[in-house]
């Protein structure tokens, strides 16, 4: 009897989850997952500051609607386009760090692999902020992952590097202030 009842329970659960025909998804606990991210993407696009966009992602998770690649890309775009993290800018805020934090959440928490568009937003931020060293790293990653890098962004990054070299800011000022190991006299 126990075997029969356990088979019936398993079959009933399998039928419940399979009856969706692939349209419905269920989480680990058997709750239905909402896959309609379109209204959430619109909310992200309406945000003025990128901290608000992060709150939209939190709300999505609370409502059992995990963000997909399109939602993450819209959030990366919002981080790039927003004037600041909050209405009153936060000291030492970094859009690049915010983007990398979001990419980490994408890959490791939600198992969503960033695509070329995702990394293009990061590269655009490197170019816009003048961080040409980070731009080199992102370009190398894009070349390895996608076999191409947006040529216009590479040229703009090279222009940033050339400008920094011409201004004498090719290397961070802290390196220029450090004393060489060979210049130290030990007595």
From Swiss-Prot:
Source species: Leishmania tarentolae (Sauroleishmania tarentolae)
TM annotation in the entry: none
Annotated region described as Disordered, given as residue ranges: 160-187
Purpose: Putative RNA-binding protein.
GO cellular component: mitochondrial inner membrane
Transit peptide boundaries: 1-17
UniProt KW Membrane keyword: yes
Major subcellular location class: mitochondrion
Keywords of this entry: Membrane, Mitochondrion, Mitochondrion inner membrane, NAD, Oxidoreductase, RNA-binding, Transit peptide
Protein name from the UniProt record: Protein P18, mitochondrial
Upper lineage: Eukaryota, Discoba, Euglenozoa, Kinetoplastea, Metakinetoplastina
A GO molecular-function descriptor: oxidoreductase activity
Compartments reported by the entry: Mitochondrion inner membrane
